[in-house]
Curated annotation (Swiss-Prot):
Lineage of origin: Bacteria, Pseudomonadati, Pseudomonadota, Gammaproteobacteria, Enterobacterales
Catalytic activity: a lipid A disaccharide + ATP = a lipid IVA + ADP + H(+)
Organism listed in the record: Salmonella paratyphi C (strain RKS4594)
Functional pathway: Glycolipid biosynthesis; lipid IV(A) biosynthesis; lipid IV(A) from (3R)-3-hydroxytetradecanoyl-[acyl-carrier-protein] and UDP-N-acetyl-alpha-D-glucosamine: step 6/6
Name by which UniProt lists this protein: Tetraacyldisaccharide 4'-kinase
The EC number(s) this enzyme carries: 2.7.1.130
Pfam families in UniProt: LpxK
Amino acid sequence: MIARIWSGESPLWRLLLPLSWLYGLVSGAIRLSYKLGFKRAWRAPVPVVVVGNLTAGGNGKTPVVIWLVEKLQQRGVRVGVVSRGYGGKAAAYPLLLTPETTTAEAGDEPVLIYQRTGAPVAVAPERAAAVKAILAAHNVQIIITDDGLQHYRLARDIEIVVIDGVRRFGNGWWLPAGPMRERASRLKTVDAAIVNGGVARAGEIPMQLAPGLAVNLRTGARCDVAQLSNIVAMAGIGHPPRFFATLEACGAHPQKCVPLADHQTLAPADVQALVGEGQTLVMTEKDAVKCRAFAEDNWWFLPVDARLSGEQPDKLLEHITSLVR
């Protein structure tokens, strides 16, 4: 229903317009207060790059963060990552991730980024506190903030927006009548717009999510996902249909697709109940970090990597590395 309202297919969005006007007024006032100097943002002693969204819902932001961290690491840059840690609840903040940190403490996306990149990761509702925690423990040269485009309390040097190339901005209205956190005109002020799927427009960087080999949660064995049989697909991400479509494109045709809420807590019994005898469970990598501790032999995940095309990605990386002292 939310998807139909935000796309404009359902006329119910009109009923929510008063709330959207209020949301837009408040969010605009917050940004203006920092722009005019009534409120002050904290500036880190190292460059800060924000990777965020203009819309609610999954746009492919986390794969972009991983891509950016890995590309900078390949260039010899020491990178730290901060996040709000949505979906997790730590005993105290800021929380600096370790190999023992769970998704219940830090949230699924920070744990995934930490495991994939090995970069220092810290979470805190106040992102400046997370940055300070990393700087106190690690000699990093740059900070990437996973989400937080609208978190103006943290000053930033580079802003990158990730856009769903198929859904783009829906009906264009602020939450809750539409998907917008800020209006599309905000694109004029960011340093780069990366478009996940669909057709990129002038000035935008095209991106595709490229699936790798399926990985067994228990053994680490790898195989082509099309070789798995009797698949039950599970996706607890911002836009589950994208994952199911990826499986189909890989030649894996699920018998059943189970969409879950983004950042949903997964109980062992609930996940086990999804799979019958002779079936294979295939999930996203983000779900896998939550399920690995209680995984069964027939559970697999399909990792995806961001692939950015054209000359713009290299120019963006050059611009970012030029800020590193």
